[in-house]
Amino acid sequence: GVHWRNSFSYDYTNMDEMRWYNPEHGNGAAVDGRLSKYAISDITSTFTSTLNYAFSLFNDHHIGLLAGYEAYKNTYSMLHAHATGFSNSEMIELSMASTPYETKSKKDHERMQSFFGRINYDYLNKYFLSFSIRTDGSSRFAPGHRWGTFWSIGGNWRISEENFFKGIEWVDDLKLRASYGTSGNKQSDYLYGFQGLYDTGNNYNGQNGITHLQIPNDELSWEKSKNFNVGIDFGIFGCLNGSIEYYNKTSDALLLEKPLAPSTGFENAISNLGGMRNQGIEIDLHSTNINTKDFTWTTDFNIAFNNNKITSYPQKEEVVGTKIRTVGYSIYEFYMQEWAGVDPVNGDPLWYMDVTDDKGNPTGERTTTNTYSKATKYKLGSALPSATGGLTNTVSWKGVDFSFMFTYGFGGKIYDVYEENLLNDGNKTGYQLITEQADSWTPENTNASNPKFIPNNSNTSNGRSSRYLHNA
C-alpha cells in the first residue's frame, strides 16, 4: 500500500560558559586575572516528508518504492566578552575588571535541501537489489555549485535460504552483500567558504577599522567520493551474530585548507583539491552469552582497520602545521624536527639534521644541531590508528540493565601539546611544570632526559618536534 509520512524535529541548545584564570597563579598571573564569558545558542530544525509504495508481483517478486524531501536549517549565535585585571579574585564579574579587552558576537546560518528516492526489489526473500539516488543543495557552496547528485546500487544474496544449505543446522543465517555508489561531503570549518569575510571592531591609530578575514572562492563545491563495499553477515549456533566487511572509498575535490602566499595577506583558503583513498576491514560481533527468564548477558565487539593515503595533490608536497600532504602518505602524516636528546657536555637541546654535499643535496647521513631552525624536518608517522574498536557487555536482571563499554585504538602517533607546555625547560612563563622537568641537565646530572633549565629560555627546546610525539 501507500504510506505518506511527515516528521519535524526542533533542537534548541542554550549554553552559558565562563573561563576564569586566577590572578594569583598560572596563566592569569601575568595579567592580574583573566575572565571570559560566552553565551551560545544553537537551533536546528529538520522537516522530512516521505512517500512509500510497496507491492508484489506473482507472489514471489516484492518491490518497494520511496520518494522523499528534506529541509534542514541551523542557526548558531555566540556572544563573547573578555577582560583582564582583577584586584579581587572573589568577585568574578566582567564589571570588576580594570581592562575590558574585547566583546564579540556572531550569528551563523546554514541551510540544506534534499530530494531522494529508492527502489528495493527482492525475489523469494533470497535475492535483493536496491538502487537509490539523492540530490542535495547546501548553502555552504557558491551559487552554481550548491547542488550535488549522488547514487548507489547494491545487492545481497541470502545463501542460508538456498535448498543446498538447509542441512547445515548450526548456521542460522548467512548473507553475502555488495554495493557501489557515490556520496558527497560538505563538512568543513567554513560555513561561508565561497564568500569574502570581514571583521569589524579592529581599530587602528584610534580609528575604526575593518579587517579582511577570508578570501572568496566562487568555485567551491561538494567533495565527492566513490564507495565500494562487500561483506558477509552471519548468525551461528543460535547465539552469535556478526559481519565482516571490506570497504574502499576514493575521494576527489577534497575540502581542504590551501595555504596561500604571504603576499596575498591571507594564511589559507578553503578549496577543492587533491584525492584520497580510505580502505580497510570492519568486523562486528554480537553474542548472547546467557539468556534466561530473569537474566540476560550479551557482548558486542567491533574492530576496524583503516589505511589512508593521498592519491593526488596539485603540489609535490605541502606542509600544514605539524602535518604534510604528499602523494603516497596519509593525510595525517606528522612532519617536524626529530628530537636527538640532550648534549651531555653543556645541556643543549639537540635535533637531527641531514648532512648535505657542496650542492646542498642530502648524502644519506645525519648529524645533530643545537639550533632548532637548522634541524631537518622528517616524516615521522601518521596520527591515524592502525586499528580502533570497542567492547560492550550488557547485563539485564529482572528489567534492570547494567552495561559497560571499553573503546580502544592502537598504532599511530599522538602529539602531546600539553606536554609541550608543561615540559618547556623555561621557554614559557606562567605554566606549571610536570615532574619530568626535574630530570633536567646540570653539571652533576649530565645524562638527564631534558636540557638545561633556563628561566625565560629562548633556545626553542620545546619547539614542536618528536620530543612530544608518542606512540598511541
Language-model features: locations:
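Extracellular/periplasmic, surface-exposed regions of secreted and cell-surface proteins
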Residues: 1-21, 30-334, 391, 395-398, ...
